[in-house]
């Protein structure tokens, strides 16, 4: 497969950042401030979109990806694996460079690519890193970075997310599974 040579990040292309404010520890505002400061210190132009509702991420990522391509910049996703997959998919469709700042709960993508666990350290790593190709997968037009799931498992994940929205993270997960139709 042919690859396109990309300049190192030290060439200072602008950043277009999409942050999922609800990811991980829900520190979106603080991370946005850190990115603004880091970009300013590095002399890099940037725009930041802080997204409060996860369902808005794909549309906002598409707009941001077009902006990144037009500015010859980098589309940077900040959030969990789902956020990063949505932002990467938008970058692929737009033909924009993509980078990630893992900021979710599990951060499988970040761990598999050697990103630091703390978002501030990951941001510094991206500032001083180089662009390089990564492997992505696609099933039925859906891009994924870590894995794709079929059958019961994705339904359980959707149910878990709905449960967390309704009851919060502190309720025992066992209560949810005890009431799930599969177990009746």
Which sequence ranges carry the predicted segments?
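A residue-level signal for conserved active-site and pocket-lining positions in enzyme catalytic cores
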Residues: 20, 81, 154-156
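Short amphipathic alpha-helical segments
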Residues: 29-31, 87-91, 111-113
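Short beta->alpha junction loops/turns
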Residues: 24, 53-54, 80-81, 115, ...
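Glycine-rich beta-strand-to-loop/alpha-helix junction loops that act as flexible
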Residues: 21, 78-80, 101-103
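ATP/NTP phosphate-donor binding region
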Residues: 1-75, 85, 121
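Beta-loop-alpha module in the N-terminal Rossmann-like domain of NAD(P)-dependent dehydrogenases
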Residues: 58, 78-93
